């Protein structure tokens, strides 16, 4: 039988361990480097002379909005790519190409809409996310420029998923490597060399994203790719696009609810601790994102293996892929937990040298990331549901942890505990523990049923 995946890997026959290594390592590097687009900005901004702490807090206010922009890329890309991978497993590449073409046009339409909205409602949005009279100056400087590069963000994040789902892991990694390395180079030049400050950080980011977007579109239009962008597929077909968006709802909810959570955290921290508390949360969020990226990358690398073999009805390879992926996720998360609990100041000093900000963030991070060792299980199970095309359970789990558990705790705990700031931060690990317990319980039952059904068929 001729397999219609990329020539780099054989998702149907290669050893699962070797496959996971080949796909996960580039995906992990891609996730880490991709995060550097924003994290590097914060690292440099936090060390701007005299105004670093307040400028960092201002950019931190922009993060929830940036998450919303990324969420729409997840809606289309992370919904369409697994479906394309499933059809490749069924030896139906023409349908997979049509799905990709529909997603490409959808991303363009979403990008234009988001750009107009961000520019038109910039001030009220920033005020909604708790920008103070001091921080809104820097928030507007960053967001005003970043909004203009929305289409580049959508193309890079959304369409790169279609490179990865074909097995072109190295090419997928190059997408973010090119842009992120350029961003790392341009940031100090624009921020300090041209004395542009926060504006320079935003400009460096969108230039870098633009180069990455060009790379993605060039590859998907070239000769090397299995699935190719074709003009005849640029017409929206509801029967192809809507199921992809339905599958993308889970990652969309996971990403967009992070924005809602940031709003809730900022509201409470602004009330009890002011700009210093919000600045601390900016740092904690940055460290948490950076810590979780390898897990996201590992499950992203494992997803094509699971999706392809699910489509090919190969239950044994699906099981091996999931178990190995989960073991790696849990091991990594445990190491991160130990490092954060023992050496919190090391992580905080990356973003600031302000004494007041360092003092609060150093004790807060130990609380905020107390249950991070369990998140490997959570993410592995949740991403495997997506690999199976099981949108309903994925959406429920995404909503359960953040909307049903975490957000109520953010508002309830300060009314119970005397230390209000501590109460806000401790909501995170409590929600993590409850969510992991629920996810693992549901997954075990569903996974057994899925394997049994595949064996029967």
Where are these regions (language model features)?
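Small-residue-rich hydrophobic transmembrane alpha-helices
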Residues: 56-116, 153-172, 280-338, 342-344, ...
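Helix-terminus/linker motif at the lipid-water interface of multi-pass membrane proteins
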Residues: 32, 36-57, 126-133, 189-196, ...
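Short runs within selected transmembrane alpha-helices of multi-pass transporters and secretion channels
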Residues: 146-164, 172-180, 201-214, 296-300, ...
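Short alpha-helical transmembrane segments in multi-pass integral membrane proteins
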Residues: 1-24, 84-149, 193-249, 306-371, ...
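Residue-level signal for transmembrane alpha-helical positions in Major Facilitator Superfamily
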Residues: 21, 36-37, 76, 117-121, ...
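N-terminal transmembrane alpha-helices
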Residues: 11-43, 47-51, 64-83, 108-115, ...
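Alpha-helical transmembrane segments of multipass membrane proteins
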Residues: 39-43, 116, 124, 158-162, ...
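Transmembrane helical elements of multi-pass membrane transporters/channels
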Residues: 22-41, 145, 179, 208-212, ...
């Amino acid at each position: 039988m001729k397999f219609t995946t990329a020539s780099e890997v054989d998702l149907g026959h290669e050893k699962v361990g070797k496959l996971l290594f080949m796909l996960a390592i580039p995906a992990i590097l891609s996730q880490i480097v991709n995060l550097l687009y924003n994290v590097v900005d914060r690292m440099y901004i936090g060390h701007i002379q005299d105004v670093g702490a307040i400028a960092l807090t201002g950019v931190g206010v922009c993060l929830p909005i940036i998450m919303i922009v990324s969420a729409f890329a997840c809606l289309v890309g992370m919904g369409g790519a697994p479906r394309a991978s499933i059809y490749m497993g069924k030896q139906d590449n023409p349908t997979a190409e049509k799905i990709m073409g529909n997603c490409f046009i959808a991303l363009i339409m979403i990008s234009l809409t988001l750009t107009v909205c961000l520019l038109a409602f910039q001030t009220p949005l920033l005020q909604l996310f708790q920008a103070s009279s001091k921080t809104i100056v820097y928030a507007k400087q960053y967001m005003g420029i970043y909004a203009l590069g929305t289409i580049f963000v959508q193309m890079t994040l959304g369409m790169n998923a279609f490179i990865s789902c074909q097995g072109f892991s190295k090419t997928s990694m190059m997408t973010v490597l090119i842009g992120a390395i350029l961003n790392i180079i341009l940031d100090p030049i624009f921020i300090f060399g041209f004395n542009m400050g926060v504006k320079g950080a935003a400009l460096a980011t969108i230039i870098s994203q633009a180069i990455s977007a060009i790379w993605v579109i060039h590859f998907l239009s070239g000769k090397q790719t299995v699935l190719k962008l074709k003009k005849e597929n640029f017409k929206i077909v509801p029967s192809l696009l809507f199921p992809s968006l339905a599958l993308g709802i889970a990652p969309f909810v996971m990403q967009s609810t992070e924005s809602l959570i940031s709003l809730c955290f900022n509201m409470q921290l602004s009330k009890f601790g002011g700009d210093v508390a919000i600045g601390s949360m900016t740092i904690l969020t940055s460290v948490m994102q950076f810590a979780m990226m390898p897990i996201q990358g590992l499950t992203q690398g494992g997803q094509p293996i699971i999706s392809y073999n699910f489509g090919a009805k190969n239950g044994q390879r699906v099981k091996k892929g999931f178990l190995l992926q989960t073991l790696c996720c849990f091991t990594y998360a445990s190491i991160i937990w130990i490092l954060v609990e023992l050496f919190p100041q090391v992580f905080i000093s990356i973003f600031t040298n302000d004494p007041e900000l360092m003092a609060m963030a150093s004790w807060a991070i130990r609380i905020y990331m107390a249950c991070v060792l369990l998140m490997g299980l959570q993410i592995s199970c949740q991403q495997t549901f997506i690999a199976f095309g099981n949108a309903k359970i994925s959406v429920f789990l995404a909503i359960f942890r953040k909307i049903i558990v975490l957000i109520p705790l953010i508002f309830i705990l300060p009314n119970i505990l005397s230390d209000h700031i501590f109460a806000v931060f401790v909501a995170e690990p409590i929600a993590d523990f409850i969510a992991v317990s629920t996810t693992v319980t549901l997954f075990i039952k569903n996974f057994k049923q899925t394997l049994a059904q595949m064996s029967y068929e």
